[in-house]
Design a protein with these regions (language model features):
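Short, conserved, GDST-rich strand-edge loop motifs in beta-rich repeat architectures
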Residues: 1, 16-48, 95-97, 189-192
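Surface-exposed acidic, glycine/proline-enriched linker/cap segments
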Residues: 1-2, 30-51, 56, 126-140, ...
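Hydrophobic or amphipathic alpha-helical targeting/insertion segments
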Residues: 1-13
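Short coil/turn segments that connect the beta-strands within blades of beta-propeller domains
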Residues: 7-9, 86-88, 137-139, 182-184, ...
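Non-catalytic accessory segments flanking enzyme active sites
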Residues: 12-16, 21-24, 50-53, 67, ...
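Beta-propeller blade signature
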Residues: 52-59, 105-112, 155-159, 201-206, ...
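A short helix->beta-strand "capping" segment at the edge of beta-propeller domains
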Residues: 59-70
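Loop/turn-rich, solvent-exposed surfaces of beta-rich toroidal or solenoidal domains
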Residues: 135-154, 180-182
Length: 278
């Protein structure tokens, strides 16, 4: 994979050295009369991993400069790498082979220096999340972690010295639907009281205040949302054990329906005939 720099003058990319990695064979049996084995380097438990590194090269050509990320490259994964907007720096996430420690580096593509700004740990296992959005003119960013026992979104300063909880509460954030820096909110799905029901909540990105429930309280069940980029509108889906899925376009601020897209009326009639209890 590769990433263009914000100014389009450089490319940061991964290089994978698969020497010594065992071969796994996939079978291609779809485009000819006879199947063909396709060799693919693929490590198994306890065997050698690929050695992966991240480098930077000018878009005009020339030599690649490599980041000297600490640690054995065959026992660590450079799982994520992205340019920080409007800068010559990249953020690199380094996951150990046990996948319970995520070390976050900021690398300067001019000097090739590295700074560890954050290390997230778990006794068992860490998921890699793609919920990073830069805020406050790249002075801070959002970060997903289970550090307090719940899956929550945090606001972290660029130097990693400050970390503030955004989605405060005794619940897991099931899904991040929209991070809206302009409006100052993050919208997410959670089930604080009943795991069979999912609702949309929002919390302030500055970490102040309590979580606000966006979904109507009088509609118990499963809610899902596809939110517009400006967080003003959404495609809202609702269903429960006795209500077939109902889909509509809504004003997200008021949750007022703008247009009904699908109400599954025929199915709702058939379900009503069954006389199921609520």
């Amino acid at each position: 994979g590769f990433r263009w720099s914000p100014d389009g003058k450089n490319i940061a990319y991964w290089q994978s050295d698969t020497k010594g990695v065992g071969t796994f064979y996939m079978i291609n049996n779809v485009d000819s009369n006879y199947s063909v084995p396709i060799p693919l380097p693929y490590p198994k438990v306890g065997t050698a991993n690929s050695a992966v590194k991240v480098g930077v090269i000018s878009a005009a050509g020339g030599n690649t400069k490599w980041f000297a990320v600490p640690g054995d490259p065959r026992n660590n994964y450079l799982a994520r790498m992205e340019y920080i907007p409007g800068s010559d720096e990249v953020m690199i996430q380094q996951l150990n082979r046990l996948q319970n420690t995520n070390t976050v580096w900021v690398g300067n593509t001019k000097t090739m220096s590295l700074k560890n700004i954050l290390t997230d740990k778990d006794e068992a296992f860490l998921d890699i999340h793609d919920n990073i959005v830069w805020l406050d003119n790249t002075k801070s960013f959002t970060w997903t972690s289970e550090k307090d026992g719940w899956l929550h979104l945090y606001k972290v300063s660029r130097d990693g010295k400050e970390m503030k909880l955004i989605t405060n509460g005794n619940f897991d954030v099931v899904n991040i639907n929209c991070i809206d820096p302009a409006g100052g909110y993050v919208y997410y799905i959670a089930s604080p009281d009943n795991f069979t029901q999912r609702y949309l909540y929002r919390s302030r990105l500055d970490g102040n205040g309590e979580a606000e429930k966006v979904s109507p309280s009088g509609m118990p069940g499963q809610h899902s949302y596809q939110i517009s980029a400006d967080a003003k509108f959404a495609i809202h889906s609702f269903e429960n054990a006795n209500t077939p899925r109902r889909i509509s376009l809504i004003n997200l601020n008021t949750h007022q329906e703008i247009k009904l897209l699908e109400d599954n009326a025929a199915l709702k009639t058939k379900m009503a005939e069954l006389g199921l209890r609520s």
